[in-house]
Each structure stands twice: as structure tokens, then as C-alpha cells.
Amino acid sequence: MASEMEPEVQAIDRSLLECSAEEIAGRWLQATDLNREVYQHLAHCVPKIYCRGPNPFPQKEDTLAQHILLGPMEWYICAEDPALGFPKLEQANKPSHLCGRVFKVGEPTYSCRDCAVDPTCVLCMECFLGSIHRDHRYRMTTSGGGGFCDCGDTEAWKEGPYCQKHKLSSSEVVEEEDPLVHLSEDVIARTYNIFAIMFRYAVDILTWEKESELPEDLEVAEKSDTYYCMLFNDEVHTYEQVIYTLQKAVNCTQKEAIGFATTVDRDGRRSVRYGDFQYCDQAKTVIVRNTSRQTKPLKVQVMHSSVAAHQNFGLKALSWLGSVIGYSDGLRRILCQVGLQEGPDGENSSLVDRLMLNDSKLWKGARSVYHQLFMSSLLMDLKYKKLFALRFAKNYRQLQRDFMEDDHERAVSVTALSVQFFTAPTLARMLLTEENLMTVIIKAFMDHLKHRDAQGRFQFERYTALQAFKFRRVQSLILDLKYVLISKPTEWSDELRQKFLQGFDAFLELLKCMQGMDPITRQVGQHIEMEPEWEAAFTLQMKLTHVISMVQDWCALDEKVLIEAYKKCLAVLTQCHGGFTDGEQPITLSICGHSVETIRYCVSQEKVSIHLPISRLLAGLHVLLSKSEVAYKFPELLPLSELSPPMLIEHPLRCLVLCAQVHAGMWRRNGFSLVNQIYYYHNVKCRREMFDKDIVMLQTGVSMMDPNHFLMIMLSRFELYQLFSTPDYGKRFSSEVTHKDVVQQNNTLIEEMLYLIIMLVGERFNPGVGQVAATDEIKREIIHQLSIKPMAHSELVKSLPEDENKETGMESVIESVAHFKKPGLTGRGMYELKPECAKEFNLYFYHFSRAEQSKAEEAQRKLKRENKEDTALPPPALPPFCPLFASLVNILQCDVMLYIMGTILQWAVEHHGSAWSESMLQRVLHLIGMALQEEKHHLENAVEGHVQTFTFTQKISKPGDAPHNSPSILAMLETLQNAPSLEAHKDMIRWLLKMFNAIKKIRECSSSSPVAEAEGTIMEESSRDKDKAERKRKAEIARLRREKIMAQMSEMQRHFIDENKELFQQTLELDTSASATLDSSPPVSDAALTALGPAQTQVPEPRQFVTCILCQEEQEVTVGSRAMVLAAFVQRSTVLSKDRTKTIADPEKYDPLFMHPDLSCGTHTGSCGHVMHAHCWQRYFDSVQAKEQRRQQRLRLHTSYDVENGEFLCPLCECLSNTVIPLLLPPRSILSRRLNFSDQPDLAQWTRAVTQQIKVVQMLRRKHNAADTSSSEDTEAMNIIPIPEGFRPDFYPRNPYSDSIKEMLTTFGTAAYKVGLKVHPNEGDPRVPILCWGTCAYTIQSIERILSDEEKPVFGPLPCRLDDCLRSLTRFAAAHWTVALLPVVQGHFCKLFASLVPSDSYEDLPCILDIDMFHLLVGLVLAFPALQCQDFSGSSLATGDLHIFHLVTMAHIVQILLTSCTEENGMDQENPTGEEELAILSLHKTLHQYTGSALKEAPSGWHLWRSVRAAIMPFLKCSALFFHYLNGVPAPPDLQVSGTSHFEHLCNYLSLPTNLIHLFQENSDIMNSLIESWCQNSEVKRYLNGERGAISYPRGANKLIDLPEDYSSLINQASNFSCPKSGGDKSRAPTLCLVCGSLLCSQSYCCQAELEGEDVGACTAHTYSCGSGAGIFLRVRECQVLFLAGKTKGCFYSPPYLDDYGETDQGLRRGNPLHLCQERFRKIQKLWQQHSITEEIGHAQEANQTLVGIDWQHL
């Protein structure tokens, strides 16, 4: 379709390109009706530029639009070339002091916790780095897009409003200056004309609702029949639904559908079909039909191409206006005037109003363009920002109504702009007074919560997804209210007072609808059938919590406002209570001669609600009366006399009784909804305005009434009145065993009631209740949290309530109460309580949950025991109450309280079974302690001549009256002190008696109080000494008893050993043999340990016994026994790679014989080291497979291992494995038990002999191949080559291994082949042996690299599993040839050998520069026995090993010299003196000669020798490890310690001369010709001529990329990253590969790629190209490390970035500055280098099953 249209498009382009912007502008300047001229031009040109075919060409369209449409407008404004005109305007303009940078999605933003007026005040990175705030306590987050930098806004910052860039110069003063003075009259007029026309054009066309025709002045005569089927975005349908629908409707591929869906999601709309009307309408019908089943259908329009064209240009015009006003503030001012100018239709007819009111009808892309324009124009001009704010506030209710009906998120709604006005203090105040904004917002909120019950309270429907969606929208209004209140007024005008109080009235109306909502009644008999709705009410409460606090803060700032608010709140509360007492029968309660009237009400029978916001608001205001002293200054203005304390306490008391009854198990049948409500009532998010305020309200009530009356009402509400008012109730109950659970219930209720009294008296750390500061309250919270256990900063912050600015106030006080302990490698930094703060611990702290209370008690008692103190936890000394609450303390000494205490102590003394509990007693003791503390405080602060009214000690000393004559409380305490059953409370009772004596002494002789104190102490001391002596005696008895038992046990043990001597003898023998294998240090002299060659140190192989982890049977490892195997994991690896871009095009044809030195991809084998019988493992694996098949039929989930790929978990440690390695004895000692003659050939002789043998082998193979097609000539040619003496090519050695071992050799070989080449298993493939040798070599190289990086010695102590793995792997690789075809292995040897010793048989061998010498060495050494087994000439295998090693070493030295860098070094010596230096120079000269002088001149010999030594070290270390594990020769002690250079020791161990060049000199006869053949290779010449590259040595270590120290640099880098597939769109999930540094767009459809026929995410695809299937990524927006392996495995890992408190911040929720922790990054790097990523993922997925369910392949 496109190709047919191309010529037409081109033709149009040409006709348009002839237009001249200058000419058009000239015509316009002459025109009388500019409006008509411009519209005609647009009508003619726009449809010819935009929407010309099925696919948009944005670049082409924009170029044409600029040239033909926007260019003339720019010429018109400037009346000259805009390239000259605009710079002039820019020059005349005064730069703005506002930054105004609009944030991109994911860009870092910074807020200063010290200076920002509220958390919405943010800086961009550039301004932040140039501001004073970088040294303050700042918070860092990533922007969701939209919003702008507040730098330069003096209202946003308490100090430092400007950064370096936007700073005012000393001469400037901030003043409102008219920006138009910088423009000439003409420019103003022209700009005004063109802005008015273009802004109106854009608004008209974007709000145009007809799909097939244009506005009159834009219509053209001829109209084509070209339409678009335009699909619009909504937030209801998922990506999958849209993709599926499009595939059906417009018959496109999935990939195209994904492209459409991505664009629709990003821009808000996309044409999905282009053609005539009918063709497009057909698609629309299908889309609507397919998406209307469950929800409302997707919005689709069939739109004429010219309408679409004009709308596209409308958006372009708005963007253009935004960019043009950037040249001058004057232009910005003109645009603002145009936008806000009332149109002919009066109210709401300005262009800005029209856009705002049509917001919900516009698509996403259009909205974001005009929002962006508003931000860069109206919000950047302070004068017009105010006018815009007024328009916004006027339309507020309508905008919110539209938003409720809108199906887009708030981020793309115009209502989200509220934050820009409402948080600016002067604007917020102006809107509050002029537009009554507070009332408007609350009324708008109430508009949307229509459902009410009969009492007018909110009633929420069941919380469905739709309900939650709508309710979320409504909550945004609360956020707006919060914004308005966030900055408190510093001065009040009458108008502000009046409007705030009007708002307060509206707020009370809102709270009134919440007072008593969601009432509940106790279920009796059967469980509740349907959980009642509770979430919505609590969500509302949570959202309003800060608003309620802020309203109180506002009230506190002005005395008149506070008094009025208090009156209003009280009036509303009285209204709410009006209906409750009607028709209730009053009842009279009396105890101890006191009586009170109250209503008959049972919490357990009537309705009760946990929502009492009006009562709680009044409690808050009452505290403010005390705190601000208004209550004492203007008592006549307050309605304090009207207060009815019983009314005030009624509802809060019911609420607290409800909690007590729930705890006592009385509401079990009411289900989880009630449990959840109680939880949130106490939770840190809600408690400040719920539970805490209920306590305050009760404290208010108690302080205003007779405490006896209060306690009686309380007993009545707790339903305990009967129990305490009836004598002998306890005795009666204990005798009636049937009522066990009722007794238990009553006990709990008594405990809860006592706890409540403790709280009422003890909780006075609220400024206004007690004489304390706000910081004392926070300190106390922290002390009690840390008395449970040491805590991390984030835990501590979570346990403290936040204010509206997300601040807890913790940082200001934490230093005074806690020490900070820095974190280790994994943990977090911890705060520990300072010892001196422990005395402030209160066991009954009101914010403890039950679990926290018991933990804290245990921790504090343990601490006291450790400090050798008694374990009592007495109540701490408390600050005095404020005068308004002072009478509260009398509750402790009133008659009813003393009666309750006495009764409970009486029960404890008489010990009536279950009618009392220790917990109850503990609380009573605590209350007595509190009363004693209070009296002591009163006495110590007594004023002369002032009568002491608090006389608790006197009252507890008096016995009860007749007829009961009960003992005094004091007497009962003394009795209880000796009760054996109350051991746990003895210390506390002792403390109380001591306290009592001290007070008595103070009262007796107030003049000599110190003496009295001292006497009390002496008494106490003597009793304590007695106690100590008693404890000591008991401890001594226990010690003697322990010793006696131990002696008996050892005697029995000895006796048993004597009886079973033979058994023990055997065990000891086995032990020694086992330890010998473990120790690997047989009795060999250290003098000269040699690992290989004829002089190899002979070590007797100890017997090896191992135990199968599955059947626990022990077995010796022998050649003929059943195979024992290690669980192993084989994986492809690029950890050592120097070129990750290489890929194998066709694995089936690839020849892996020669490994390139860039090690582009190797095969690594790891093992956990656990041993099994091969048959046990097979059985285990079969059962895993069967289980997996059954599981797959049941559930379609992944497991952490992939059975189809042979994976399983080690049965013991659950380590991921995919094969097993057989355990073998050293293969060399088994396979070469042949007589060897003493005189072994030298290198030249050996090379000649091997070359001859190779020729014979090749000849025989050719003969074999040619047998079928033999000709006489061939046969003759073959007979010419004589067979060397002693060589028997027809001999095939017998395989010494048992069938079981042979099977395992094949199993592991096939696994290495399958994984290494990514092919299907085929045990007969000739490449299997190559991959076995390759994985052995690569694994050794990996280990050597790790050891070198960590600067550890090559034979230092290796972890057991690693040691076992390397030993088994090397022995396996050496034995594998026995199960391969002999000719195949011989063929590999011949080819490998030919790469060093040239042969005519092979043409295409790699040059010496393209071979990794260690892989070559391993291949040659391990393939050599296949040739040597047919050699009976007496030449030994050891000799062969040595010659191969020497040959490869020399080749490696030549390789090093050819590729070494030859810069001069400053420390070069003038004349070479050393033997090595002369030798190396001579060798270099030889190379120079053979390369035809292409090799650069040598620097000094010293430099050359030094670089060769350094370069060959990795090869020598790898060789040492290889031969050590191959031949079992222990390592010399020198190689087991670090520090020295091991070069000489390695040479000795490996039978090398320390001067390596001797090798060349000793074998010069053969080496010269070999060197010549190596150097003559054309590739070597190309390299030396600079035509190609080569790897130089030593190869540098691969490390993960360098990360920036400050995390925000990373966020900034990622925010600039555009999704590569979405045309410059910012990526939503930028993810950084830590291996290569690539930034990827993860977790989104746009960047999915196809991998092996499956669609996978960008990260998964990248792991295959970069890490051979394993990857490490950092998800930048989440600050989270992601490990991926294969397509189905992954896990999240702790990131290496920590905040100042040593904690990570995954998800960037806390926003503390993050810095790179090198240790943690090194740990991740080590996991990568050790190939442990897959293992780490396996363990993580086993530990956390939710990880298994994640679709990792889509990341």
C-alpha cells in the first residue's frame, strides 16, 4: 500500500517545499484579516503534511511543519529571520530566577528535610548540586514525570532558595517587574496576534468533537475518502486484552499489535487502520464487540484523515508556543494574557478554562502537551499563576467531578496541578480567603460520598475493585486539603479566621458523618456469616489522620480560633450524643459509700463503633487549651462549665472496653474484620488520632470528675461491677469449677482495666497533658522501642508516627538515647539503647503490643541479671501533670481504687485457684509503685505551709473496717513477700516496701531526710546480703552435683571402650586412612617435589573411603567397584571472556578443538562436593522426574530447577546441579603400569618419534577409509611409510573401569558436551572428549584467576568442595578417553600436535596467536595416552607429559614475545648483565629475524624478562594445579604461603629451568625450525603489520563495571536513557547490566526480543549475548540487583548501595542518600567470578516460593 503512495507523497512534498516562510509572513503582515489568512493557509497545508498514510513519519512531518507552517509565524513575530530575531529577544530578556525545569519520568529529585517548606518542594539534580542543601539532610526520589524544580521560589525554602546558577546578584532585588518593557510595541502586537490565533486554533481543534468534518473555516472543497480507525487508551483494559483484540480486529501480527498497544499506552491514542470509511468502521465494530464483555468497551473512533491531521498539528502548535516563550519572559506574559482572557461567551470561556474543563475528554498525549504548556507559561509567571489559581479554584468542584468519571490516572489529569497552587503559602492563603477553598474542597469531597445510613453516617458498599478505584480518586481531594493546610499561617487576619472557621465547620460536618460509622454488635451463638466492610472507613481515617492533626495545629496558632473551634466541636459532639441516652433507664452504682448514676449500657450486647473522630478532635483541642494556657487566661470565654464528664468519657471508654473484650476472647465470632480494626486502631499509622486521643479524652474526664465515680462507671462498662461490689465473689467463683472460661475472661478484663488505669495515670508525655516538650515524647517512644531489641534506622522510623512532612523527629534526639553500631557485610547498622536510659523503661508503655511487651520485659530482666541487679521493673519517675490535668493523680488514692487493689491482693493472699492471675497482681504492684513515686515526688517538691493532699502511704497502712476487718494493703504486701509461689514478684515487692519506708522516713523527719534515706538503704542492703549468701550456697550445691554426674559419665564411657576394644581398633585404622586422604600430605620429603616427567615424585595413593549421602553406606573408591559420584553443575561462561560479541553460528558444525585466547565462551564445572552412589543418584533423579511430571499436571508453575534439562537439587544441601562427576583414582597410575626403560628420549627425538607414529596412524586411517575404493597406487603409497619399532597400531588397550564407572564417564562427558555447545546430547559425537578437556581447563583457569585477584597462593587452603571438584574433574578428563573411540581421540591429538609441530596433513590450523596455550596443554596431555598406549618402545607417558609441557611453554613464551607491549620503562638498565636478560634478548633477536624484522626492536633485556615472567605466571599456576590434580603430587610448602613471588618454586615443581630460555637453548636444533614455522604464518605477519589484533599477556582480570559513588548519578544517567524501540520515549524500567555496562529497557513489551523461538524481555535476551545465559543487573528505579539464569530463573539480590545508616533502600521508598558500599559490591563480583549466580538463584527460589512464580523471561 505504502509503495503505491510514495510518488504521490513525493509530488506533494515538492509543491509544498516551494513555499517560502518569508513570503508567507510578508503576505500576513500586509493582510487586513490575519485570522482568515492564517486559517486558509492551515486549511490548505496541514492535511498535505500530516496523516498521509497508514504509518506516521514524525521526522518528515515535523520538518515540513516547521518549514511551511511554523516558520512563517516565527518570521511574522520577528519581522525578520527568526534565526536573528529570537536571539535578540533572548538578549534583551532578563533571565528568570526560577528554574522551572519540568521533570522527566524517572529523573532524580531532591528535597531538603531541613529547609523545604513541605516534601513537595524539590530541586533538579543540577540545582541541588549547586545549592547549600547538598550538605543538609536531604531526601532523594525519582520523579513520576510532571512537576518542576522549585529552585528560586522563595516560598518553597526556609533558607537557600537559590542555587549558584539562579542566584540573585547583589544589585538585584526580587520585585515584580513587567516583562513587557523589554519588548517593542510592534513585537508585542504581532506576537499577540499570532499567539491569539494559534492558541485558539489548537484549543478549538483539540476540543472538536465531530469525527468526519472540520470547523467551517478549516474545511476544504475536495475531500478524499480516507479515514483512520483511532484506538484510545484507558486504564481499565490490560495490555494483553488490547493486543488480543487488535490481532482479531485488524488482522496484524502479535509484534505489530504490541507496537500499537505500546503507542496507545504512551500517547493515549493510535490509528490502527487506514482506508475508506467502511473498512475502518468494520475494525471499530470488532474492537467494541471484543472488549465490551466484562467492562465498558475500548474507545474507538473512525476519524477523517484531515481531522486527525489538524489535531496532530494542534499538538505541535502547543509545543511550539511552549518553546517560543522560552526566548523571553515578555512572550510568556503575552501567552498568559491570551490564555486567560475571557471569550465572548463570558464565564469559563477563556482558552485556559476551556482546556481545563475538557481535560477528561482529551486523550493522554494531548493532556500532557497542554499541561506542559501551562507549566512553562502560567506557572512560571507569578502574576498569572495567581489568576490561574483563582480560575482553578473556581472550577474545582467541576474538575473533580470530571476526574471521578475519567478513566485515566491522576498523573495525567489537570487536577494533579493542584499541588502547584495549594502548597504555595501565599496562594493557598489567598484561595482560602477569596475562594473559601477549604470549604470548597471538603464539600467536593462530601459530594462523592453519597451513601449514608439512617443517622446520616457514611456507609460504604462492599470494597470491590471498582469501589476501591473510585474511592482512590476521592482520596485525592484529601491530599489537596492536606496541601492547603501544610504551611501554617504566621499572622491571622479576621478574614482568614472567618474562612478557616467556615472550613472548620465543613470539616466537622465531614467528621460527623464518620462519628459512630460501621457500628458492630457482638455475635453470640454462631460465627458471623459475611465479613462486614471495614477497609474503606479505615482508609478514610488513615488519609484524614494528618489533616486532623494539621487542623489542630492551625487552631493552636491563634487563641480566638482555638476558643471558637473548641465551642463548635463541643456543640457538634453534644448533637451526636443527643440520641444515645434517650429512653435509657439510668442505674445507680455504689461502692465504698460512693454512688453515681449512669446509663445501662453493655458493650457486649449493644452496638459499638471504633470511629469517634469528633470526640477525639475535642480531646486534641482540650490538650491545646492546656498547652497554650488559654484555659487559664480566658476561662470565662470557654464552655468548661457546660462539659459533662460522663458524656465525654462514654464513647472512648466503650471503645477501649471493646478492645479489652476482644483480647479476652469475647468477640471471637465476629471474624477478622474486627481483629483488623483493633489492629489498626493501635497501629502507628492511626493511633495518634484514635487510641492516643481516647486515652486523652478519658484523662480529661477523670480530671474533671470524682475519681470514685469514674472508676465505678468504668467497672460497669468493663462488666466487672458485680464482681467487685459483691463480697466474697472470688471465693464463690473458685469453688464453681464449671465457669472456668468465664473466670478466665473476667481475669483478662480485670487485667485490661488495671492496664487502662496505669495508662491514664502514667501517659503524660503529651505536651499539654504533662509538663513536657515534644522531644521528650519522641525520646520516650525510642527508648521503649529499643528496650525490646536493638533496631535498624528504618525499623525505628517505621515504629514512630510521621507528621504531614513524613518526619518523625527522631534524628534530633536519637544521639541522646542510643549508640549506633555500624553494619558488617550483610546486616544493617543498629541503634542500641544507652544503659543510662534503661531506668526510664515502663513495662506498661501504652504503645507496646502484647508481643512487644513480653519481649521488652524479658530483655530488660535479662539485662538486669547480667548487671547483677535485682530483676524488679519498677515504674519510672514521671513528669508532673499540667494544672488542667493535675487532679488526675487522685485516682490512685481514691477509695474505690484502694478497694480494688485490696480485693486483688486479698485474692492473692488467700490464693483462690483460678480466680486471680499473676498478671493481675503484677499490674496492682505497678499501680502501688506509681502511687508511691507520686507521693515521693509531692513530698520532695512540697511548698512550705502547703497541705499535702496525696497521702497514699497512710491509706495503705490502715486495715479495713468492721465487719470484714480485712488486713491493710501494706500488711498483705509483707505477707506476699514470703509466699513461695510468687518468687517472680519478690524483687518488686521488696522495692515497694523499701519505697514505703523511704517515704515514711521523709514524712517523719522532713528535716533530716537524707539520713532517713540512708537508713532505709542500710536495711535494704542487709536483706540483700542475706539473699546473696543464700544464692551462693545454692549455686555451690548445683556445681558439686554437676561434677559428680560428669565423673559417672566418663567412667561409663571408659568401661564401654574396654569391652569393645576390637571395634575401636578397626575404627582407628579407618580414621587414619581417611585422614590421609583428607590431609593429602603423605610422608614425602619436601626437598624436591616434582609434579611431572620422569623425575616425578612418586606418591603412594592412600585408600579412599567415602559415604553415600543417600543410603549412608561407606565404600572404597577402586577401579572395579560401583561408581561413586559428586553432584555437579556445568554451565557456559563468559566470566573470563575478552570478547563477548562472538557467537557460534551453527553449533552442530562448530569445531571447538582450539580455544581462542580471548576465551570468548568457556564451560565451567562446579560442585557442592556431596558424594552418592551412581545407582542411588539415578534412583533419586528418576523420582524427582516422576514427581515433576505429576506436579506439572497439577500446577503450571516453575520450580527452581528444570528437570527437562537434567537439573536437580543436591539431596543434602539443595544446591542446583545438572549432572554428576565420577570419583576416580589417579588415572595415570592405572593406565601406565608398563615397564619403562631408563634412557628416555630428549625433546627432538621424542618429537620425531611422535611425528612418525602420527603418520602411521593417519596412513592406517586413510587405508581404512580407502579400503572400499582401493586402487593399487594408494596401497603402494601407504606401504612406503615404515612402522616405527615398538609401535603397535593394531593394539587396543583393555578398559580397566567397571561398567558402572564407564557409564558415569559417559554421563558427565555428554553433559559437558550438551551444555558447552548448546546441542542435543549425543555420546558418540567426536567432540565430546574436546569439551571434557575444555571444561577441565576453563574451570582451572577460573580458579587461578580468583586466587590471583585475591592475592592468595596457588596452593593455599582451598574450600573442600572446590578441592574435591578440581580433583574429580581433572581425573575424569584424564580417564574419559577410555570410553571414547580410540581413533577419534588420536585424531584430536594429531591435530592439536600439528598446531605446534607442523604437518602436511592439516591446512586450516589456527596460528600460534589464536590458540589458548593452557587449553592446548590440557588437550595434548589428556589425549596423548590414546597414542602412547600403542607405543611399546619403552618411552614413558611421563616423558611425553614433560615434552608436551615444555613444547607448549615455549610456544607460549613466543606468543608472549610476539604480542608484548614494548614501551620503554623509566627504570630500564643500560647494559643487560643477567643470564636471563641476555638469553631473552637473544631469543627476541631470533624472532626478529624470523618475522622479517616486522617485530619491534626489543627494549632492555631486564624489561623484557620481567614482562615475560609476569605474563607466563597465570599459565604456570594453571599448569601446576592441573598436574597436581592429575598426578597427585602434593604441593611444596613454598607454594602454600602467600607473600613471595612463586616463580622459581613453580618452575621447580613443574620440571622447568628457572631461566625459561634454557628450554630454547637446550633444544635449539628442533626449536629454531619450529619458531620459524610459527613466525612464517600469514596471520602472525598480518598482526605484526598492524592489520589485525591479538590478545596480549597477562590477560587483564575481568571485573564488573565501575559504579558511581553516589546513587543519584546513576538515576540521572538512567533518566536520560530512552527506550531504543519507542522513538525517544523515556524507558520505564531502565536496567543496567553490571557485566558490560549496557542500559536496557526491562519489563516492558516494547523491547522484547525473540530467543530460540520465544519472546523474552530485554534482560533475558542480553544474558544470552553477554553472559551466556547468566546475568547481573541493577534495576535503577528500584535500586535492586537482579540475577538471571536461563529463561526461567531469577532472583532479587541486595544492592551494593547503602544509606548513612547502613541499610539498602530497595524501591527507593525512604529516599535517604545512597552511597556505594565497596565491600558489598565486591561480594557480588565474587559471586559472579565464582560462577555462583545460578546457585544463588536456586537457594533464593527454594527459600522463597514467590520468586518461582515470577515470569523472569519477560524481564
From Swiss-Prot:
Transmembrane segments: none annotated. Zn(2+) 1 binds at residues 99, 124, 127, 149. Disruption phenotype: Male mice are viable but not fertile, due to massive apoptosis of spermatocytes. They have a reduction of testis weight of 68% and no detectable sperm in their epididymis. The seminiferous tubules contain reduced numbers of post-meiotic round, elongated spermatids and accumulation of pyknotic and zygotene-like nuclei. Female mice show severe prenatal lethality, but the rare survivors are fertile. Fibroblast cells display spontaneous chromosome instability and fragility. UBR1 and UBR2 double knockout embryos die at mid-gestation, with defects in neurogenesis and cardiovascular development. There is a cross-link at residues 94, 158, 165, 248, 255, 470, 488, 568, 779, 789, 1496, 1599, 1689 (Glycyl lysine isopeptide (Lys-Gly) (interchain with G-Cter in ubiquitin)). It catalyses: S-ubiquitinyl-[E2 ubiquitin-conjugating enzyme]-L-cysteine + [acceptor protein]-L-lysine = [E2 ubiquitin-conjugating enzyme]-L-cysteine + N(6)-ubiquitinyl-[acceptor protein]-L-lysine. Induction: In models of cancer cachexia, induced specifically at the onset and during the progression of muscle wasting. Dephosphorylated by DUSP22 at Ser-1694 and Tyr-1697, leading to subsequent ubiquitination and proteasomal degradation. Zn(2+) 3 binds at residues 127, 151, 163, 166. Residues 1019-1054 form a coiled coil. A zinc finger (RING-type) spans 1108-1214. The modification N-acetylalanine is found at residue 2. InterPro entries: ClpS_core (IPR003769), E3_ELL-like (IPR042065), E3_ligase_UBR-like_C (IPR044046), Ribosomal_bL12_C/ClpS-like (IPR014719), UBR-box_UBR2 (IPR047508), UBR1-like (IPR039164), UBR1-like_winged-helix (IPR055194), WH_DNA-bd_sf (IPR036390). The RING-H2 zinc finger is an atypical RING finger with a His ligand in place of the fourth Cys of the classical motif. The UBR-type zinc finger forms a pocket that mediates recognition of type 1 N-degrons. It exhibits preference for arginine in the first position, and a lower preference for lysine and histidine. It binds N-degrons with a methylated arginine or lysine in the first position. This is E3 ubiquitin-protein ligase UBR2.
